[in-house]
């Protein structure tokens, strides 16, 4: 085996080529299809205000000396909130018309803060002692009527609305909840009407919903993979939305190259009205080196990953989201030579075996407006010495800490021109096994280089890209965009004996052509120009900086 390793070293087979299961590039979530719409989906006709009754001891031509005003039934405003209104009526004689103005001012305060179905009135009372009581009637939702659902559970929709309709009813919060419901991929359209209920302050909400088709399928071809395992990949994915009728999501994907078969299944199920999600993820990869001359060594690998986790939104509005999550995952990787002989191509794995048990704490934040989208993601990973995790005294193993941060800014420059900036970084306090390292190079990080051209324990990668429409639906042939870009990335390792091959910093620039024939069919061709030369480029379309991506959505 020592002779084999020597031959591999002389031949210049890098760790990236030798590992058929390389690290996953630090991709950010996909760009939004569109900026959020601002159309109102809630119809609120004029609702009757609470009845105004005359105080029993006061007629329209009388006035009383007011020494105290008590607002009863109020749960929204503090004494400090009401003081500017009440102070102008205290310590003087007040007429009947002024009492009506007082209740109107309190009602207006409710309305200004979104409590449109709330108000105040002056009930019959004895005012001879100078104490005036104003009764607040705070609006409540009496009933929710839902029409149009067949597959989706009424309870799921009611829970989504009920979170924002707790008394007192705030129409701004209710409309935000309806907009979130409209963004649910399982629902196509939402129409809502608020009508008067059976008593003052009570309202009824009538929802008319149209369900979306529950399945989304995608087929695509691209040349994103390392040439060592076959760069051209064909993939198929299927996503199910609310198949169980409770807001659940099920997605699966299968991708195949000449040397790789990779598939995963991802499941998320909300378990309460606060939209807490339980998540499960499973991925399996089988790889084989097919690049000449190393294909003669029958180098292959397998990898399995399984994660269980929970995700909790803390802020959830149509324009802003913040969620935290935690997951426990197991990763098992095996590499072989001569088809079935365990073999390690880098420090850390034991006879080709890498086991990682990791606790991952995630924070995700998104902010949207009509003109821009900001997204950030932070992940703290703690490698645990559990479930047979790889353990070494003086080499990378399964006990480690790493932080991965990702940021994305999309800005509309007008005329459908977009500015897109991305930044991702991984910082590790420990030497990492290959399956946890950070990679740069390829169509999703630094264009102009091979996929995973450089790999390290820590790294930073960023890009700036413009998307400029040059043709809009010429003869019914869709939209064509030009996408000039600049990408920069660098990686480094811990330990002086584990230096990243020079150069460890990659810089690429170039231009792409995006063609969107329709919502179902699109294609992208990108030409990346490396500004920092590397010696290990190989011979492929990727080596020439050319990447393509063709996507078709049949449903």
Question: Where are the regions a protein language model picked out?
Answer:
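Repeated loop/turn-to-beta-strand initiation elements of outer-membrane beta-barrel proteins
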Residues: 215-217, 244-250, 273-278, 287-288, ...
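Membrane-embedded beta-strand positions of outer-membrane beta-barrel proteins
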Residues: 217-219, 238, 250-254, 278-282, ...
